[in-house]
Amino acid sequence: MMEIGLNHYLVLSTILFAIGLVGVMRRKNLLMLFFATEILLNSVNISFAAISHYYGDLTGQMFAFFVIAIAASEVAVGLGLLIVWHKKHNNIDLDNMSTMRG
């Protein structure tokens, strides 16, 4: 039976990073932009944890927990701002964000 090694995790992480990057570049909906950013951050977490496990060091796993904490605070603040924006303007498209200036 085939063993799942470091390369498998890194390939998975690269695929998820590419999906998240395409999502960040192509999406106009702010909620989908948040989801794509979370996919990016979680792909980095997979890389940190896999490399950390491969070398037998816990540093990468600690970085992954730190990134999870930062991502959670980012989502809390971002979704709060998104809800306020939606209540005021009834949409969450990035094209309409230019009215926020001033």
Swiss-Prot record:
Subcellular location as annotated: Cell inner membrane
Topological relation to the membrane, as annotated: Multi-pass membrane protein
Q: Which GO terms describe its molecular function?
A: NADH:ubiquinone reductase (non-electrogenic) activity; quinone binding
**Where does the sequence pass through the membrane?**
4-24, 31-51, 65-85
Protein keywords: Cell inner membrane, Cell membrane, Membrane, NAD, Quinone, Translocase, Transmembrane, Transmembrane helix, Transport, Ubiquinone
One of its Pfam families is Oxidored_q2
GO terms in the biological process aspect are: ATP synthesis coupled electron transport
Q: Which reaction does it catalyse?
A: a quinone + NADH + 5 H(+)(in) = a quinol + NAD(+) + 4 H(+)(out)
Name the source's superkingdom.
Answer: Bacteria
Major location (coarse): membrane
Gene3D superfamilies registered for this protein in UniProt: 1.10.287.3510
E.C. number(s) listed in UniProt:
7.1.1.-
* GO CC annotations on file: NADH dehydrogenase complex; plasma membrane
Q: What does this protein do?
A: NDH-1 shuttles electrons from NADH, via FMN and iron-sulfur (Fe-S) centers, to quinones in the respiratory chain. The immediate electron acceptor for the enzyme in this species is believed to be ubiquinone. Couples the redox reaction to proton translocation (for every two electrons transferred, four hydrogen ions are translocated across the cytoplasmic membrane), and thus conserves the redox energy in a proton gradient.
Q: Which family does it belong to?
A: Belongs to the complex I subunit 4L family.
Relate the assembly described in the record.
Answer: NDH-1 is composed of 14 different subunits. Subunits NuoA, H, J, K, L, M, N constitute the membrane sector of the complex.
Q: What is this protein called?
A: NADH-quinone oxidoreductase subunit K
The species this protein belongs to is Sulfurimonas denitrificans (strain ATCC 33889 / DSM 1251) (Thiomicrospira denitrificans (strain ATCC 33889 / DSM 1251))
